[in-house]
């Protein structure tokens, strides 16, 4: 079994992640629940865009070990210091960014107040020396003693040759994630499982690594264990704040997938080919976004992007409006691709008031003008085609109504194609229009997700009746599906709806998914 499991994972080859060949050449004529991966609705017909992984850890374990071994190789201490200074200079973020979020941080909140304790979820990040690095609510200074106690618990258990994973008491969960040289702690009074909380802590960890690289992070603490990492992260807290909001509201982070802008395949193909033609020697990824939806992604041959890296790019773009002011140029580490170094991203909007944002990722630090030329070539080519108008029209209506599916009792659903790493879902109906109701529905999906992916007792189906809605979840080797029905729906009608929905997705897959991703 272990041998088979190892064959199913991705491997590092010359610094490039090579995905497992899971795509099947034969697609099913009609969707059925037992579809194998590669033939389900939404499966890519040519090649995958994203890395496939069974867990958050199996793709980075080797990379992180390598980063630890090579943190100091070939670089003097003076070079490290120069690199850190350059990093601080490049990532000196204007204070206006922190005002871009509608849910601004309550940094001045009294940590001894009832309001602070009443938050359903807290996140803390500290160093292994117990130095505070980040807290979602309140100030790090006010919580330094609390974080010291957390580190003492971790150290005490480690001294006994063990690892502390979680504490459950009085309806509260405290989950620990040690990613040397950092310790991340989540405290929750929600119904989230330990695994779901670990997933969120993983995202926070990768967000920090994306700002510094794991190599720099290890070097800092190897030379000074009690270093105050906030000195380097000052001004970037808004990214972590916004990521935590996304974790509560974006189904893609739950499903480990990305959603596409619904667009006729003919128009998407023109956009993709226009982006493919605007290439450059050092260009690795060309990504076109429409708000929080992917329009297309063109990659260098044999280079693959992980969904976590793409979510971090989404978060970077969505956390600030400053990129609308012109052409941005920023360093970014894609931790699932390479934890040791920076890429450099050219970020700009196609038009000042547009939701269409183009991200060109280069391996070269001094490549700004080349990337700017690539954008101009793309715009010159695209603007002459009718597909550009079709794209702008699609952005005006970035989702679709569940009514189009033709299942009266169905209120909402999430469908993920495993082989493509893409998912689709309709807009929220009126009953879930408020932010609170949307977060409640997502929390219900999280509970279903936890049941399907239980570490020791995973389920293939799960049906649940509630006063306000009925829910059905299903997982096969090809897809994951989560459905929300009216409370008047029966179990029989819910299961009958699955095949009907899959047939509808198959019929619409050209519009809802990227079936033929392009490469340079």
Language-model features and meaning:
Residues 1-520:
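Intrinsically disordered, Ser/Thr-rich regulatory regions of eukaryotic membrane-trafficking proteins
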């Amino acid at each position: 079994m272990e041998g088979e499991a190892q064959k199913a994972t991705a491997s590092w080859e010359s610094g490039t992640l090579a995905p497992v060949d899971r795509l099947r050449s034969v697609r099913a004529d009609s969707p059925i629940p037992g579809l194998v991966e590669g033939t389900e609705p939404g499966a890519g017909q040519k090649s995958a865009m994203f890395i496939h992984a069974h867990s958050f850890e199996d793709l980075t374990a080797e990379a992180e070990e390598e980063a630890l071994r090579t943190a100091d190789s070939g670089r003097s201490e003076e070079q490290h210091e120069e690199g850190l200074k350059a990093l601080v200079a490049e990532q000196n973020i204007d204070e206006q960014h922190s005002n871009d979020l509608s849910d601004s941080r309550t940094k001045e909140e009294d940590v001894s107040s009832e309001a602070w304790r009443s938050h359903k979820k807290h996140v803390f990040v500290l160093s292994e020396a117990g130095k505070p690095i980040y807290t979602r609510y309140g100030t790090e200074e006010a919580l330094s003693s609390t974080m010291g106690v957390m580190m003492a618990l971790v150290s005490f258990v480690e001294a006994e040759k063990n690892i502390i994973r979680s504490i459950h008491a009085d309806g509260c969960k405290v989950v620990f994630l040690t990613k040397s040289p950092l310790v991340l702690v989540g405290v929750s009074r929600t119904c989230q499982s330990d695994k779901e909380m670990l997933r969120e802590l993983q995202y926070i960890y990768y967000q920090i690594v994306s700002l510094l690289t794991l190599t720099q992070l290890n070097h800092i603490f190897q030379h000074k264990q009690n270093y105050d990492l906030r000195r380097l992260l000052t001004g970037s807290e808004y990214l972590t704040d916004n990521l935590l909001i996304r974790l509560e509201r974006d189904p893609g982070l739950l499903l480990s997938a990305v959603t596409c802008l619904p667009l006729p395949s003919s128009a998407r193909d023109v956009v993709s080919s226009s982006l493919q033609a605007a290439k450059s020697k050092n260009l690795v990824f060309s990504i076109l976004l429409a708000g929080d939806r992917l329009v297309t992604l063109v990659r260098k041959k044999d280079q693959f992007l992980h969904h976590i890296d793409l979510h971090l790019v989404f978060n970077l773009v969505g956390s600030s409006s400053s990129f609308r002011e012109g052409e941005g140029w920023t360093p970014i580490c894609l931790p699932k691709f390479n934890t040791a170094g920076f890429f450099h991203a050219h970020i700009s909007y196609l038009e000042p008031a547009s939701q269409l944002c183009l991200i060109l990722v280069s391996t070269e630090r001094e490549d700004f003008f080349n990337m700017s030329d690539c954008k101009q070539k793309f715009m010159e080519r695209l603007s002459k085609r009718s597909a550009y108008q079709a794209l702008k029209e699609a952005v005006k209506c970035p989702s679709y109504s569940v009514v189009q599916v033709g299942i009266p009792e169905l209120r909402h659903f999430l469908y993920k194609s495993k082989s493509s790493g893409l998912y689709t879902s309709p807009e929220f109906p009126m009953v879930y229009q408020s932010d609170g109701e949307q977060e409640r529905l997502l929390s219900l999906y999280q509970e279903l997700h936890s049941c399907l992916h239980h570490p020791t007792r995973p389920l293939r189906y799960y049906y649940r009746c509630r006063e306000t809605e009925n829910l059905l979840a299903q997982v096969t080797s090809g897809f994951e599906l989560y459905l929300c029905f009216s409370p008047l729906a029966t179990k029989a009608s819910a299961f009958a709806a699955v095949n009907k929905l899959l047939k509808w997705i198959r019929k619409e897959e050209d519009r809802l998914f990227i079936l033929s991703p392009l490469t340079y």
